[in-house]
Regions:
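Iron-sulfur-associated redox domains of electron-transfer enzymes in respiratory
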Residues: 1-116
Length: 116
């Protein structure tokens, strides 16, 4: 685990990003899904944020992270709620803007903690 983990606070260049499999998770996912650490965080560098509460477009920051580091893959963990829709959208836009071929996977969790 690295520190910081908030998307807004993490630097755009850091040694822990080199060759990393990245997890970009909505804030609520770790609380809704009981085995979040083992199933999603293990072996990944984790960034968290809430598109609704943070009120920013993460695409710019993520683009800089992708441009400045060798990211191997990105897994997005989001909730089924509409406000989480911005997270995979921002990641996909950032990968496209970086010009790199980084695989993106999206995992969706419902409020009861089930994978959907």
């Amino acid at each position: 685990m690295q520190w910081p983990c908030q998307i807004k606070l993490v630097p755009v260049r850091a040694p822990y990003f080199d060759g990393a499999n990245l997890l970009v998770a909505a804030d609520c996912t770790a609380f809704a899904y009981g085995n979040f650490h083992n199933d999603f965080m293990k072996g990944r560098v984790t960034l968290v944020g809430c598109p609704k509460l943070d009120g920013v477009n993460y695409a710019e920051k993520l683009t800089q992270i992708f441009l400045n580091n060798n990211i191997r893959s990105v897994t997005v963990a989001r909730m089924t709620v509409p406000c989480c829709g911005g997270l995979p959208f921002a990641v996909k836009n950032a990968v496209e803007a970086s010009g790199k071929k980084i695989p993106v996977y999206v995992v969706t969790i419902d409020p009861k903690g089930n994978l959907v």
